[in-house]
């Protein structure tokens, strides 16, 4: 119930989609039947909730594509970097913010039978939990600071394999060495290392960089939306996502594939995709700058 309530709040049309459970969160389906999933872990409800808002970002993009173009190539989403920007904007930029947690904390406490006045259910506690930085083995569970290291390792590994610089049999050792170099962790078994993702066995080679590109674009879009709509985060703090969704519909979703990703981002933000807004976001959230 909590996940579906949050989906409705961010703008998901429940008449055109649904939420289910899977081992790995994903978004799929068709234009008027957009289905998302999340996974549940005992002792960590926030992980499941962040999975819901992440996949809801993907789903909102799909539900926002122009109906008149549904049967045409121009009506498709404009590539996975932009798609990941929509999920990461919703999850990282918005739903891990202090403003969102100010609204969500009492909603979460009520849904899970907690005392909204108790410190463990406070907005500050929940915000600290979802922005905690701690290196770990699993990419999908990584925090916002260490996540790019997981992507860098995978990018280095797949380019070395494709270019013939590394044999497949050497992948586990090379993968583990780079995880230790970047995160200081010793991988004990391959299921925590090079075998944890579905991308390579499913043929999605070269996909991993779209997550970092998406994170950069998400920060750039959120910054532009904030500039255009100064009350944006105040609205979020009241549980009102209409300002954000209206802006995204006009500047991203309704564009579909009518222009390149680069042009869509430039038109929406005034600049081509770049790292500046992303770095400002990280410094502000984690360094207080």
Per-region residue spans from a language model:
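Acidic/polar loop patches that form or flank catalytic/metal-binding clefts of enzymes
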Residues: 15-16, 68-70, 96-106, 168-169
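Active-site recognition of the HExxH zinc-binding catalytic motif
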Residues: 47-67, 84-88
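C-terminal, non-catalytic "cap/extension" segments appended to globular domains
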Residues: 151, 155-289
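Active-site metal-coordination segments of metallo-dependent hydrolases
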Residues: 73-84, 146, 205-211
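Post-HExxH zinc-binding segment in Zn-dependent metallohydrolases
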Residues: 76-118
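Short helix/strand-bridging catalytic loops that position acidic/His residues to coordinate divalent metals
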Residues: 37-42, 68-79
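Contiguous, non-catalytic segments that form substrate-binding/exosite surfaces or channel walls
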Residues: 1-45, 279, 286
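All-alpha helical catalytic cores of prenyl diphosphate-utilizing isoprenoid enzymes
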Residues: 1, 6-20, 114-153, 185
């Amino acid at each position: 119930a909590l996940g579906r309530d949050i989906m409705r709040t961010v703008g998901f049309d429940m008449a055109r989609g649904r939420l289910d459970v899977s081992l790995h969160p994903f978004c799929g389906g068709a234009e008027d039947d957009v289905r998302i999933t999340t996974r549940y872990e005992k002792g960590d409800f926030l992980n499941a909730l962040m999975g819901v808002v992440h996949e809801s970002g993907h789903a909102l993009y799909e539900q926002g594509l122009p109906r008149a173009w549904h049967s045409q190539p121009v009506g498709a989403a404009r590539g996975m970097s932009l798609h990941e920007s929509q999920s990461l904007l919703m999850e990282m930029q918005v739903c891990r913010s202090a403003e969102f947690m100010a609204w969500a904390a009492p909603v979460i406490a009520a849904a899970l039978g907690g005392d909204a006045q108790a410190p463990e259910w406070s907005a500050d506690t929940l915000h600290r939990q979802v922005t905690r930085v701690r290196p770990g083995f699993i990419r999908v569970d990584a925090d916002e600071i260490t996540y790019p290291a997981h992507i860098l390792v995978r990018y280095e590994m797949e380019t070395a394999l494709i270019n013939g610089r590394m044999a497949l049999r050497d992948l586990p050792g090379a993968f583990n060495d780079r995880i230790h170099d970047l995160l200081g962790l010793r991988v004990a078994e391959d299921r925590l290392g090079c075998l944890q993702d579905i991308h390579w066995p499913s043929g999605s080679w070269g996909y991993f960089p779209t997550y970092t590109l998406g994170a950069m674009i998400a920060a750039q879009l959120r910054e532009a939306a904030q500039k255009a709509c100064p009350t944006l985060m105040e609205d979020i703090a009241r549980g009102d996502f209409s300002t954000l969704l209206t802006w995204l519909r006009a500047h991203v979703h309704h564009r579909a594939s009518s222009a390149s990703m680069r042009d869509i981002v430039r038109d929406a933000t005034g600049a081509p995709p770049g790292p500046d807004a992303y770095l400002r976001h990280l410094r502000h959230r984690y360094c207080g700058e």
